[in-house]
Amino acid sequence: MKEVVVDVAPKCIKGIEFGALSAKDIIAQSEVEVHTRDLYDLEKGRIPKDGGALDTKMGISSNANECATCHGNLASCHGHFGHIKLALPVFHVGYFKATIQVLQCICKNCSAVLLDEQTKRSFLNDLRRPHIDNLRRMKILKKLLEQCKKQRRCLNCNHVNGVVKKAASGAGPAALKIVHDTFRWIGKKATPEKDLWDKEFDEVFSRNPELEKFVKRIHDDLNPLKVLNLFKQISPSDCELLGIDSARGGRPEMYIWRYLPAPPVCIRPSVMMDAQSNEDDLTIKLTEIVWTSSLIKAGIEKGISINNLMEQWDYLQLSVAMYINSDSANPALLPSSGGGSKSSKPIRGFCQRLKGKQGRFRGNLSGKRVDFSGRTVISPDPNLKIDEVAVPDRVAKVLTYPEKCTRYNRKKLQKLILSGPNVHPGANYLLKQNESAKRNLRFGDRVKLAKNLHIGDVVERHIEDGDIVLFNRQPSLHRLSILSHYAKIRPWRTFRLNECVCTPYNADFDGDEMNIHVPQTEEARAEAINLMGVKNNLLTPKSGEPIIAATQDFITGSYLVSHKDSFFDRASLVQLLCMMSDADIQFDIPPPAIFKPVMLWTGKQVFSLLIKPNKKSNVVINLDAKNKTYTPPAKGFPNEMSPNDGFVIIRGSQILSGVMDKSTLGDGKKHSVFYTILRDYGPDEAANAMNRMAKLCARYLGNRGFSIGINDVIPGSDLKQKKELMVEQAYLKCDELIDLYNRGNLETQPGCNEEQTLEAKIGGLLSKVREEVGEICINELDSANAPLIMATCGSKGSTLNVSQMVAVVGQQIISGNRVPDGFQDRSLPHFTKNSKTPQSKGFVRNSFFSGLTPPEFLFHSISGREGLVDTAVKTAETGYMSRRLMKSLDDLSAQYDHTVRNSSNGIVQFTYGGDGLDPFDMEGDARPVNFVRQWDHAYNITFDIEDKGLLPYQIIELVDSILHPLEDRLVRYDNVGKIIPLEDSDKIEYIDQNDAEREFYQSIREFTTNKATKLAEIREKKMLKPFLTEPAEDFIRLDESDESLVAINQLSKVSANSINKFLEQCIYKYSRAKVEPGTAVGAIGAQSIGEPGTQMTLKTFHFAGVASMNVTLGVPRIKEIINASKVISTPIINSVLVNDDDEIAARVVKGRVEKTLLEDVAYFIEDVYKNNMAYLSIKIDLNTIEKLQLELNIESIAHSIANAPKLKILAGDVSVTGKDRINVLVTLREPKSINLMKNASADYKGTDASIVNSLFFRMQHLKRALPRICIKGLPDISRAVINIRDDGKKELLVEGYGLKEVMSTDGVVGTKTSTNHILEVFQVLGIEAARASIIGEIDYTMSKHGMSVDPRHIQLLGDVMTYKGEVLGITRFGLSKMRDSVLQLASFEKTTDHLFDASFYMKNDKIEGVSECIILGQTMNIGTGAFKLVNSFDVDKKALEMKPTLFEGMCEVSATA
């Protein structure tokens, strides 16, 4: 029976030590030696054979037998190990790499570590440091390995040591061989050992000259037997240097197989099928190993040829390797199991069972299947509250909750027991207090059981209305993909939810399925509803925007209700109010807007009642916001006079102007009605308003009727004509441009060639046509047109979709360009070759209503295909990216000391996000309070005609009197921890943890001072004293009756009450926004960056101001940044110029930076042969040099040629003739070529022919190489483009690497120059700059795609990548440098490598992080696990004092005696 997990168990795993079994351990734990290949004893009727791989001493795999060791059945016996004794030792494939490393560190003769005593001692001291962590230990061992590899001779026995490496493996038998190339270092130097070696071979060659050609490939073969003997000689202190802990029984020979453990039978069960059985891969491999081993043993006893023995040994080696890791051999080269054919599928070794998504780690430890869960299709139900979910009664009967019987609920539980399992509400099981087994209520006497129900018994009852359940939809991309709802049991077969809650789940009702989970303890229920409840998650932690809000039909309904021409008589009004309230709320109906001829109320009044139904409701909101389609009023008029009623003004919960559309009700807007209610009056009120809105809109829209049909998209004849005319005009303009292009007269744009310019211009023209036609189309359509209503209020689609249906579909774009040429020089065979016209390059002039022509249809489907492919590829890319982010950040949490630390207590940030505020509570622009809205709100709710208006200086004084005490509380400490007095604190440069709060108070002060200044200005305009400063005593007399004063009081009176209210709310909101200790800021940050990635487009380029300067954006860019890639697709250095107004100055700097090759400025290079010499003559084009503003003259070019690397031209051979000629003399003075000739023949006389030949080749070589010589600029930089910014200033965009060189170029402001290549920033400017660069780049990429992510999340990612002092990518390599936990790394990637590594170096995992705690089923120390609850006992202090021991007591007695 499953029991509830209890957190406070008496014993708790605090750490896991890894290690390997020695040969002794393997034999000690073994119950039987496996020595025969037979599995079954056929003579005794197919029972498992003794000593075979299925011996019953190792356990059983079916219920029919019983275990011969413990006599248990399948349920009670967990199995026992056996062992196989191998005839010869073999390498362990998991430790193969480590074995090679050990061999590289020791002498291959005497097994001593190849270091002198002093070095050994210093390394030992480093390794024995107390509290050294695994990361530092591994670094030390790596350094030691590097030093040992350099040592050529052993310092102990003076033996020569060469290179130890893995044999060049084809695959198969050679894969696990180690060779020792003894004389690799020696080369030609004579040493006695080498001479002896050569001598021996000479004797062999004299007998068999054929062998001579193999001499290069002769190595010393280190077979497992040799290695085993070497390892046995290693001393314990040397073991420690090799990273093996001999104090814990570690020895290097443990990592070579001599005895092989045979696992219990129950983990490799046989499948019986009528008189024959199917065996597990492991069993078959074990029998192969036993058989091969016995063959070798028999062969050694009989004395078989060495060739056969080695072959069998290799096969044994391979079998053992595949038993552990079946990837270790190439299946194509394996001897096949079934006679002639190749073995079909690779076997599943132990490693294959652990690794991968379905392996033990990810499939069964990090994530498991669970009980008490259900799954079915979802459908909408607007009559449910947003925090409810309708559960079908069939599901409710299966899912149960264990309720303990108390005196309060005994009667209820008795009723449920009587109902039984088939009637809802009922119960399925009963667990009596003193019994261990559950009673199934399907059977037995329920009446009797109900009577005997005692307090303390547990009844597993059906879930009922009001039970807390978790609701989830995959893919769970962020925290809000699983929320807690209250169950509502209903008939039918689907889960139902309010449509407002679709956004966080990203659910729609086209057949989506969702999962439900029922928490089984009171603690779990309390945590679920408080932390995951829908009401507590109306906002997204990504940016603090509302995510649960009105969608689709609700927005359309609200728009139609609140429209200017919506009027309702009393009957309709009352009906609407009942719809929104279930008829259980008292409504205070306001006076009607129209009295005669009949009383009518406006839709805005209905909506005002929705926000505040009656006087008892304390919701008073004040809001000013633009609608989605806001048309500004004529100049000088206030916003509310917008001609299309597009500006919402709400005062005291009364809607005065504007309509309700997506911007005021939808998600993602911080000036929406629900957000305002939530921030000022809490989530309950916001949820109530949302519930009323959902009920009202669904019913209203259903009664009114709202449909879309073909009639809605028929264009008028007028519209058709206008469209045709505009398209024709655009076609004519395009033809003119194409004509210019063909004649070569097209003026190019900066940084583009002619073709790019043509494409850019035509693209601009055609998109403009679509926009203009779209505008006309929208204006022509009737205001009651359904698609138009939806586009206007933002419930679905956009005006672009409407105009594509009605007027024109427009240009089809593929990867940011027009449709490319798919056939020879044309897009489709319907057009002529090299056609650039709009219709041949994907412009669709028809609308979807009029229908597309065949070529248009094809173009449209091409761009549709691109969208599909993009989506499919993107899903996989972003999914993997999110997983990596999550694994790297999952254990970061905010602590009680305000720092952000990881699970091993390493500090990542001193305060979260620099100010310790939670992104969830930000009101605007990542700030905790939206001052403007807060001021209006405070002003409106405290407004009293009797209040006296304050003078400007009084406002400033009042604010100071409230803020000063708060600021004085924030004391500063010096480095020793002493408090710094206030008067000295201004002189301090460094930041402390209270700086953010001081800044916040300062920003309040600035805002209020600004208000006071405005008031003073208004007073001055009305001819009154401004009073910005306090006047002298005798100037206090004021003329109260002044008309100006009355006017000012009406215009902008500021009362003491409203200032107090404003400050009180600002300070309250700031304190509420502080991040709570224990918050999993890392996990939330990872999701906040990963989740928007799924909405980004994949292949995105955008033009950084200049048409041809492409910058990678979207998912690939984010991937580059978080991988910390060394090579990125578009590295761009953005350099600010000293003289940024003058184009000539910019060109000069460009010439200094951009690589200029000789071929760019040379007319020609010709070869000249004369009788006595040959030279290359280069003519330089001085005009080009002048045009490009290059600082070059003929001498500097000659100098560059002479200094060109690799060409070896001597300076004396380069001469300048005239103004524009350079001659390069071609000689054979180059020392190398002469030496070659001398060596070629001993009697070198220097024949003429050979000299002429080599001269000719050198000439041709130089002729080819000279044009590519860089004569100016930085060799790594191929392009630089002058970009004109929006403010008219010029900057240089440089493509390529070389930040340091560009920064130090004359004419560039080095301090303002930056690059988008993170690693280069790190190398040039250091780690802080790299952190700032990571944050800036991710923020830039997100903002380009319109994603709002709070900067705190991005800062945290930047800090995680840099807090170790180097830039670590969010990959398995970066993660292994950040975290030391074996289980965390194993549950990420390369599972088995980490496990073998851990056991070789005997690592210790302390079980601190999230991944490890999940694997071991423990409470993690973040979130609600960040603290422990302690009970206080009333214990006398004396009782806790230490009592003297018996011995001490006797001493005291004797002393007194």
Swiss-Prot record:
Annotated localization: Nucleus
Function: DNA-dependent RNA polymerase catalyzes the transcription of DNA into RNA using the four ribonucleoside triphosphates as substrates. Largest and catalytic core component of RNA polymerase III which synthesizes small RNAs, such as 5S rRNA and tRNAs. Forms the polymerase active center together with the second largest subunit. A single-stranded DNA template strand of the promoter is positioned within the central active site cleft of Pol III.
Subunit-level organization: Component of the RNA polymerase III (Pol III) complex consisting of 17 subunits.
Family: Belongs to the RNA polymerase beta' chain family.
Organism encoding this protein: Debaryomyces hansenii (strain ATCC 36239 / CBS 767 / BCRC 21394 / JCM 1990 / NBRC 0083 / IGC 2968)
Pfam family, one: RNA_pol_Rpb1_3
Enzyme superclass (EC): transferase
Protein's name according to its UniProt entry: DNA-directed RNA polymerase III subunit RPC1
Positions of the UniProt region annotated as Bridging helix: 854-866
SMART domains: RPOLA_N
EC number(s) stated in the UniProt entry for this protein: 2.7.7.6
One of the GO biological process terms: tRNA transcription by RNA polymerase III
Catalysis: reaction(s): RNA(n) + a ribonucleoside 5'-triphosphate = RNA(n+1) + diphosphate
Binding site for Zn(2+) 1: 67, 70, 77, 80
